[in-house]
Structure formats: structure tokens, C-alpha cells
């Protein structure tokens, strides 16, 4: 082996070996335990960023480790290739989205290969290819036939910049998640899939996901939002109309003082027809943001409709108000308002001088003070007629039962989850396979006409979708009847909801999935991706799997057994203020910094002399110009160094702070491993280790080696605390670096240790370990070498160090045989002169002994 560690010499050579040998290509093998490790597929934006590198390194470490355990490991990769950014880039670069996307895929594929990830490239998919989305279209038509798909005109979140519909989850603080434009409300026809039919399953099956982060499961539970309550029917004064509301607090029903309805509710529209001011208010409400999350913070506005509802139990007339905080597509579009015991209702009632009636006593049994805020806690009912004195649960049931008995109420389980709107008014997506015939009938595209292919050779004007702008594209016939194709395309979450299953059989042409392959590999054993996907992708991913199961395509209930959500990658961010007061962000690579003695940045300038403001560590992003190009780092330090730093600098699920000094440290460590191996191999052949004749010092070192193997095995496999696994190997390396190399036994022990170290580091730094394994004379390629197994006998300690206390104060430390009895330990302590002087002339009244650790003698 060469004397110096030169990653540029090693890594290309090893990657070529993997490619030629097809090392990571796998097929189904019933004789082996399978392991399917998957990282969330990337969007081909053009270049990898450090977030990608972290995600895929974690997945690769797990995959390589599981392969060393003898499992048949599938680790595929592909491209989530449809989506809006391609349209923007196409307009900007005067091209079409397809060539831009395919060029990016090619570039990023080479970047992934440079990092040494062990993918089965034969399974690569790009979701924009017809051989992928044809099956998505086929499945959609099957869902339509089953009654799981419908079209309706719906109030949607509309981004006026991107000219597309956004899911509620895609609206952040009233703005588009992608371009930050203020979101508007618009009503357009949309295709929906009935995810609400699966709400109960999606909720209950979270309990089976024992190896998913609690945070993700909690977010999904909250998003599904199961509640138990009562649907209540109110009569409307001088009208045949009925008003239905849903409440989870029937115990407060006697405190209702008004009813609020959505601007789009039939009663609002009826009243607005003869009230111009109300009509203006309704129009204003219907053109504002609709994301539920915004409702809590926005100003509550309302207007009286002039209509009244009748309280079903008291007969009171309750004013009906149109209000901007009621959503037409949640529940019934109407809410009963109990301002005494609901913060939002109190805020609205206070603003518009509506009555506030308390019906729940304070915790101390007194009437609550509602002058400053509502009392939202549950408690004993009062002011509630026959229900006075009942506690929350009894009050809930008594009032619910009475409403049911009177025929004006029905107990109901409700969900916050809404059906999945999958229509997008964009070009670069999979066409929705539906056709509107001449007579207005809507039918699915026949199977023999699938896929409905998206034309790729198009001109983008940045305004309208090429397939909407081309009337010829939409023309088709079904059973000889002319019709027009749907020109909306699928939400790109459709593609990413089932890609994991297609990886099991990407070339299969006889159906959406090959049942044998899908059921061999699925469910995914380990899924890796960001927490930001908790309630969109991960919900749709779970939902789609249940749809596939119910179509007989897979036989498991959930798509992934274990989920790891990696933290974000942060980097220093710097800026200076431009002439117009704007912040001009400067890359940390271009910042010249001064630090204090604690390493904190105290001053920074750029090459042009601008004094920079240090904005702290923040997520690597284009907007703050603080991304670090992985390729630059790989060229400078090698892929193994970048991978090692990524896995060592922070626990996988925590944020990682990018520090080049840390990268340099990882590089120095690999050089030390290389140097130790070089020095060892330079001394020539090694004889086998004779375990029976090891010295105490050699036994101690071998004990440390096997304890390290046991710890690293647990850290990588069960605990997934990869940083502590690396730290343990580093600690062992320090001991190996100090170990004498005088005798044959010393060298034989070093050989055992280095072969183990190289295998423990292999999942993290595979290129250098591949070379070191060969240099050390390891059997075969390290790619097929087994994971080291800790020798239980080697870890057994012959002796123990026991701390001796007298009256709780440490007076000495003694070494005793590992199997020494309490009596033997006491006798040995009495012989220790540092201890003996405290026992002279006193009586031992009590002995506290923690075997092998502590002896405390209480004397008096």
C-alpha cells in the first residue's frame, strides 16, 4: 500500500470496481433475509446540496451495515422529476422542462456516484417517464371505478404567481410555500381522492408504527384530528331551511348565544341576495386565504345576516352571523358560538357586542369572570336548567342524549382531515386520465389508451400550460364518442406516494406491481427523510399503501417499518446592507473571519472589504447564500471524509452545524487510520493470535477492542446513534496508536484490531476501508465481508476496581478478582493502608456493597 492516504487515487478506483462487479445489484432471494433501506427520492434541481448528502449517507451506512449482517439488501434511488421549478427554469433558460430535468438527473447521478452510495442503479426511476406514470394513471382510473375519486367545484388556495392550487399544508403564514406569494381563494373544479374514507385506519395504524418518531406520529394524529361530538339541527325563523352544526362540546350547549356561518354557506348567500353590504362582505371573505392554520391568528370579521336560528332546547332566537373564521369545507360550514367558553367565540362576541353567557363553573365552584377572556376549561354545568350540577362527561352525555331523543341531534365522529385534492393547473406533471364526452359525461381514459402521454417538446411562455393552450392535445374519442381530455395534471405528491413500491419491480410491464417482487421486498425496513414531510408526503405515502393493499397489489398494512428523520444542515450566514437597505448575503466560503479564544466569530469581512454582519447558523439555503457545495468538499477532502463528518458531527435526527474545521478533523482521523495500517503492514506477515497466552496488557487491549465492537454494533444497528459509534472507534484508535508492537502477539492483536476497525468504519467510509481491507490481507472484498462479532469471553474482566469509602468519603481504590465475594472485598480493603488507618480502633456498624464497584463502611 502507498504510504500517504490519497482519496483521489482510491475513490475513483473503488467506484469503478463496484460498477464493474455490480456489487449492489440485487434480486429476490428466498434463502436470505431481505432488508429494504430507502432514502426519500430527490427532486432533480440541478445540484446536490448538503441536506441530500446527509440523507443519503445515513441510508448508505444502514444499507452497508445490514449487508454485512448477511441480509439481501435493496437500496434504490430515483428522481421525483415532475414539479413547478422545472417550468420556471424552462422559461428562464428558454428551453422545455423535459431537457432541463434530464440534464439535471444526469449531473446529479454523477454526483451521487462520486459520494460512493451503494445503489442498485438498474432500479433507477424518473417519475416523469411514461413507463412510470402510466401505472399511476391506470390506478387512478381503478380508484374512480371503485368510487374513491370524485370531482367537485371547491374553494381552493390559489397562488396567483404560480397559477396553481395549493394544499392547506402548502400554505405557510398565508403565503405559498414555494414562492412566498400571498395566497388567494378561488373556486374551481378539482379532482379528489377520498382519503377521509381511510381516516380511522390511518389514525389507528399509527399505533403499530413502533419504530417511527413520536413527533411524526403526533403530527399525523393532530392532522387527522379525530373528534367525538354531536351534529345538531337548528330551525331557522320564517324559513324552511335547517341549519346543521357540529360540536365537540355539547356540555356548553345551553351557553350558545349566536350562530356563525361561512361566507359561502347557503344562508349567507340567501341573505346577501337582498343585502348589498353583506354581499360585499361575502365577496371579501371568499377571496381571502382559507388555510385552517391561518384562522387562529387572523382578525375575526363578521356581519349579521338578519336571520335567526331557534335553540332546539330553549326555543331562544339566536342571531345568525356570516363570519370569516368559519370554513365552508370543514364540517357543515356553520358553528354554534359559546363565547363564555371558547376563545374565538369570545373575541368575536366582544368585538360585535353579542351576549356572553357562562354555563360552566370555575374550578373553585364560583361563577367565572368572563370580562377579560373566555373560560375554556371543562367543569361543572350551571345556568343550564335541568343539566345544572353535572360534570363535563355527564353533561356531555345528558345533553347529547336529549338532542338525539328529540330528533335534532346525532352523535358523530368527525375528522379534521380533508379529502386529497390532486388537480394541479400546471403543465409539467402527469396528465389526469379523465375525459369529458360531448354530452358532458365524464369517463376514465380506457386502459388501452394509457398512458396519456405528456408532450415533452413544448414551448413555455410562462403564462399558460402548453397542453391547455393546445386545443388539439385535448381532443380524443372514447368508444367512438368525441371528448376532451382533462388538462390538469396530478399533484406531484401522487408520484412520490408509490415510488417505493415500483422500485421493487421497475421494469415490470404486465401491471403496476409484480406481486412476487413487491411482497418479497415490502414493507420498507428503513425509511430516511426530513421531518418536514411528516404530514404531507408521509400521510399520502401511508394512504397509498392502503389503497395498493385493498387493490390486492401488496399484502402489508403499512409501507415502512422504521423511520429516521434526519436533522437539517446549518451553516454560518453573513450579510452586509446594500445601498437600498437590502441585505446582500455573502457565502461563508467568501467570508474572512476573526474569532475569539472560544472560537466565536467576532468580526467578518468579504474580499471587497464589506464589513459583514454575522447572522448566526441557519439552514443552508439559496436565499441566504450559505450552501456549501458537496462536490467542492469531495474534491478537496474525498468522499469518505465528507461522509464521516456528516455522520460524526451530530446525532442523525438533530441539526448538523457545518464546520470546515470538523471536516479537517475527520480527514486527519482517516489519515491516522491509514498511517497505523501502513506501519503495521510494513512489518510484514503476521502469525495467528494465541489467545491463551496473552499478557494482562494484551488482554486489556483485546477487551477494549471487543467492547468497542459490541458498542458500535448496538449504536449502528439498534440505537442508530452513528456519531457515538464513530466516537467509540476513535477512542479505540487512540489506544491502538499507543499499543506496543514489540512481539508477534502484539502484532497479531493489532491485525485482529485493524481488521475489525476497518469493518466497523466501512459503512461510513467505504472507499478507504475497501483499500485497507485489501492491504491488511482481509478475505475477499470487504463488500462481502461479515460484520465483526464481539467475543463475549474477551470482554469478561478478570478483575474489578472497587472504590472504598469510609462514612461516605472515598479513602482508597482496590483491585479485586471479578468474582470476589463481599467478605473477600472487605478483607482486601482492610489490607489497604490508606483505608486501614480510618478503621483503626473503630467499630464497623454497617456495610454497603455494590458488587464490583463500591464498598462503603459506616463506622462509629
From Swiss-Prot:
Residues that, per the record, bind ATP: 622
Any single GO BP term: leucyl-tRNA aminoacylation
Gene Ontology, cellular component aspect: cytosol
Enzyme category, top tier: ligase
Subcellular compartments: Cytoplasm
Enzyme Commission identifier(s): 6.1.1.4
Keywords: Aminoacyl-tRNA synthetase, ATP-binding, Cytoplasm, Ligase, Nucleotide-binding, Protein biosynthesis
One GO MF term attached to the UniProt entry: aminoacyl-tRNA deacylase activity
Catalysed transformations (reactions): tRNA(Leu) + L-leucine + ATP = L-leucyl-tRNA(Leu) + AMP + diphosphate
CDD domains for the chain: Anticodon_Ia_Leu_BEm, LeuRS_core
Motif ('KMSKS' region): 619-623
UniProt short sequence motif 'HIGH' region, positions renumbered to this chain: 42-52
PROSITE patterns the UniProt entry points to: AA_TRNA_LIGASE_I
HAMAP family: Leu_tRNA_synth_B (MF_00049_B)
Family to which the UniProt record says this protein belongs: Belongs to the class-I aminoacyl-tRNA synthetase family.
Name the UniProt record assigns to this protein: Leucine--tRNA ligase
Gene name, Swiss-Prot/TrEMBL: leuS
